């Protein structure tokens, strides 16, 4: 009771340890659990076991749809921090974790466990933890990069997990309006650009159109690595001929299909790294012709953009959108696109403008 825990990040959130902790619900109280994006289709076992949050206080710095539902139900809280600052936030601005838990790939011959397709803020968490428990998953992919291993000498306990398949996400198909937006954007992208594409049906459709175009000699420097880049690679569009991290596809975490994970696994072209480097505006801007493509929720006539919340309901989190907008702005020949339909249709069939005179 009273412990402060971290559950891991993205595809590295723990499964078997979560299940084991949930079985102890009635004997524990005042246990705080932090994570970034619970990525599985079902809520964490601790939330299912404690729907009224009487024993566990669960907080995420970036909501998934499951976490949004739990937030509405009253047993999941939002942890407000900008993604790029998470490493420093956990290491310097939060209490020391009693236990950090994370899923990892099996140990290699050097005694290292690969962190899988995410580094993000891991080391801010791990450096500020009294105990570290790794849950070994034979399905966890090996992702090359930097700061992407933890050695057995740094680990207190090793749990051989049940080898749960990695969580996958399948982007929705772009609708007709999004397809038209994508057509406008692709006309403005030049050969030799470095790409950051957001997630969802719209950015994926942008990637599809680029793959079908005569644009070539492209590179990748992005927060989230998604299936769109796989399709661009298959189309022969990616050369990695950028100014920094040449020949590498650079990102801080990856999520997508199993096909994407299979491509990433033990692929020397991949470069996953810590978020404070990957999302650093000064690093991003070193790439010439940096192109950032993201969606937003609302915009007003003063140029203010809302990309995070609908009223009092938080949608995701404070990710790297601003970092890539500014990185593209500072880049030589860079371009940034924030995209949204002009209207949305409400449940009663009426239309509402997403372009406001002023945002609240």
Locate predicted features.
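Conserved alpha/beta enzyme-core scaffold
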Residues: 1-360
